Regions:
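Pseudouridine synthases involved in rRNA/tRNA modification
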Residues: 1-30, 182, 215-286
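RNA pseudouridine synthases
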Residues: 1-172, 197, 281
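Non-catalytic RNA-recognition surface used by pseudouridine synthases
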Residues: 161, 169-171, 180-195
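Short beta-strand segments
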Residues: 164, 188-190, 202, 214, ...
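Short Pro/Gly-enriched beta-strand edge/turn motifs at strand-loop
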Residues: 172-174, 187, 233-238
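Short histidine-centered loop motifs in beta-beta connectors
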Residues: 199, 204-207
C-alpha cells in the first residue's frame, strides 16, 4: 500500500502526480475502480480534483507489475547535470519531486517542463550556478531540442521550415494557429523532416526554432498534418483507425551549446538521446 500525508492544500490529481510517478501511470484506472482512499473513505470515480487539506491521509494499492513499471530512467549524471528519460503518463513535477526526495540536501533544480502525455528527455541542474546557466541557454535557444512524431501524411519535401502565428485561448486551455499576424499572437517557427513514410502516416523529426505552448501539435494540425493520437488538435478518425488515445510525440534529443567561459563549457556539443522510438511503425530508437 502507498500512503501519503498531505502537508499543504492541493487537489488529489496534482498531489498524486507530484508525489508518486508510478501512480501517474495508473491514476485514471485507480480512480475509476475507486481504489484511492482519503482518510479511509473511497474517492468517487469522478473525484480527481477532490480538495485535500493538510493532515489528510491518501492511500492506494499498486500491483507488483504496476510497481515495476519504470516511470523514468537517469540517462546521464555528473556533478552539475542530470538527464532523465520519462515515460508518457508521468507528470514532470513527479519526476522532480522523486529526484529531490532521493537526493535530500544535494537536491536538483527544475529547469524545463515536459507535458505529462509526452515521453522523452528532461534535464535538471544539480547546483544554483548551473541552473542559472541552463535556464539562460533554454531561454536563448542555445539548447537544441529534437522531437520525434508520428503525423498524418507529413510533407513532400525532405525538410521544411514552417512559420505561423500562435495565440493562447485561456478559456479553452488551448492555442490557435493562423498564417497571418494578429493581436496577441506570437510568431512560431517549426521544422519538420520526414524520416519514414507508411501509408497515410509518417514518422518525422521535429525541430523547435521557437518554444511556445502546444507549438508542435497545434502547428502540425494547422498545416494539415496532425500528430497521431492527439486528442486536442488531432484527427479523430485517424486516431480511431490506429487505436491511439495518446499523442505519438517524443522529446528525442537534446544537444547542449555553451561558450568557453560557461561553467558548463565541458558539455558543449554533448547530445543526449531518448530510448523511446516508434518501433510499431519501423522507427527504431537511434
Amino acid at each position: 500500500m502507498k500512503e501519503w500525508i498531505v502537508t499543504e492544500e492541493n487537489n488529489l490529481k496534482d498531489f498524486t502526480d507530484s508525489h508518486d510517478p508510478q501512480a501517474s501511470f495508473f491514476f485514471d484506472r485507480l480512480l475509476k475502480a475507486r481504489e484511492i482512499k482519503i482518510n479511509g473513505e473511497r474517492v468517487a470515480a469522478g473525484g480527481s480534483r477532490t480538495l485535500l487539506k493538510s493532515g489528510d491521509r491518501v492511500c492506494y494499492y499498486l500491483t507488483r507489475a504496476q510497481e515495476e513499471m519504470t516511470a523514468f530512467d537517469t540517462v546521464y549524471e555528473d556533478e552539475n547535470l542530470l538527464v532523465t528519460d520519462k515515460a508518457d503518463g508521468v507528470n514532470a513535477e513527479a519526476v522532480y519531486e522523486t529526484l529531490a526526495r532521493e537526493r535530500g540536501a544535494q537536491g536538483v533544480n527544475f529547469i524545463h517542463r515536459l507535458a505529462r502525455i509526452t515521453r522523452g528527455l528532461m534535464i535538471f541542474a544539480k547546483n544554483a550556478a548551473c541552473a542559472e546557466e541552463l535556464k539562460r541557454a533554454f531561454k536563448e535557444r542555445d539548447v537544441e531540442k529534437t522531437y520525434l512524431a508520428v503525423m498524418k501524411n507529413c510533407f513532400s519535401a525532405d525538410e521544411t521550415r514552417q512559420t505561423a502565428y500562435l495565440a493562447k485561448d485561456a478559456a479553452r486551455a488551448e492555442v490557435r494557429v493562423s498564417g497571418k499576424p494578429s493581436a496577441g499572437a506570437e510568431k512560431i517557427v517549426t521544422g519538420f523532416q520526414p524520416i519514414l513514410k507508411k501509408g497515410d502516416i509518417a514518422v518525422c523529426e521535429v525541430f523547435l526554432h521557437t518554444g511556445k505552448t502546444h507549438q508542435i501539435r497545434a502547428h502540425a494540425a494547422f498545416l494539415g498534418h496532425p500528430v497521431l493520437g492527439d486528442t486536442k488538435y488531432g484527427d479523430k478518425a485517424l486516431n480511431k483507425k490506429y487505436g491511439k488515445t495518446r499523442q505519438c510525440l517524443i522529446a528525442k534529443k537534446i544537444t547542449l551549446r555553451f561558450s568557453g567561459d560557461s561553467p558548463l563549457a565541458y558539455a558543449d556539443g554533448r547530445t543526449f538521446v531518448s530510448r523511446y522510438g516508434f518501433e510499431e511503425y519501423g522507427a527504431l530508437p537511434v
